[in-house]
From Swiss-Prot:
Name of the gene: tmk
The keyword Ribonucleoprotein is annotated on this UniProt entry: no
Keywords: ATP-binding, Kinase, Nucleotide biosynthesis, Nucleotide-binding, Transferase
Protein's recorded name: Thymidylate kinase
Entries under PROSITE patterns matching the protein: THYMIDYLATE_KINASE
Gene Ontology cellular-component terms listed: cytosol
PANTHER family assigned: THYMIDYLATE KINASE, UMP-CMP KINASE 2, MITOCHONDRIAL
Pfam families (alphabetical): Thymidylate_kin (PF02223)
UniProt function note: Phosphorylation of dTMP to form dTDP in both de novo and salvage pathways of dTTP synthesis.
Catalyzed chemical reaction(s): dTMP + ATP = dTDP + ADP
Family, per entry: Belongs to the thymidylate kinase family.
EC number: 2.7.4.9
Keyword NAD included in the entry's annotation: no
GO molecular function, one term: dTMP kinase activity
């Protein structure tokens, strides 16, 4: 079986870190142990600097980051990560487990910011070509639940401080995109933790077994 790229998506507070741990545990039980982990934005020296610029409220002083500048920084970080980390890992037979990928931009910037979706799709195709994750786990949680969890963790970044309306639009776009793409599996992350973990295990196990079929 060739290596695969699995991405975990969701709003702030959806439980992506816990989900990643469950995915890793499940893959190991299935005999898959050669894995690397990525996060977006970030994952390379350049991408981490861009992450700081786009998420750290203090990084640009009083200057307002425009919506299009934000999108372009996300894509600059993403293509650097894809070309220098993700693709080489996959080519070497290593599975890649990612905390966010392009679906985040389509949801946050396309839904939350209201940026033209055709423009975003065109930009994605120009930058990434046909490169896509093999499996995406979208952890669906309401902004009320997710932001309560995120705020309990401590200081919020620039995007985490957006309004409930912003996150409601983002969630709606996530759900819309998930309904259109069979590679995106929606997990109800408002359930008790054990139920969420079981759903992730079942989804990943069944998906890997289908690859072997």
């Amino acid at each position: 079986m060739r290596s695969k790229y699995i991405v975990i998506e969701g709003l702030e507070g959806a439980g992506k870190t816990t989900a990643r741990n469950v995915v890793v545990e499940t893959l190991e039980q299935l005999g898959i142990r050669d894995m690397v982990f990525t996060r977006e934005p970030g994952g390379t020296q350049l991408a981490e600097k861009l992450r700081s610029l786009v998420l750290d409220i203090k990084s640009v002083g009083d200057e307002v980051i425009t919506d299009k500048a934000e999108v372009l920084m996300f894509y600059a970080a993403r293509v650097q990560l894809v070309e220098t980390v993700i693709k080489p890992a996959l080519a070497n037979g290593t599975w890649v487990i990612g905390d966010r990928h392009d679906l985040s931009t389509q949801a946050y910037q396309g839904g939350g910011r209201g940026i033209d979706q055709h423009m975003l799709a065109t930009l994605r195709d120009a930058v990434l070509g046909g490169f896509r994750p093999d499996l995406t786990l979208y952890l669906d949680v309401t902004p009320e639940v997710g932001l309560k969890r995120a705020r309990a963790r401590g200081e919020l970044d620039r995007i985490e401080q957006e309004s409930f309306d912003f996150f409601n639009r983002t969630r709606a776009r996530y759900l819309e995109l998930a309904a259109q793409d069979k590679s995106i599996h929606t997990i109800d992350a408002t359930q008790p933790l054990e139920a969420v973990m079981d759903a992730i295990r079942t989804t990943v196990t069944n998906w890997v077994k289908e690859l072997d079929a």
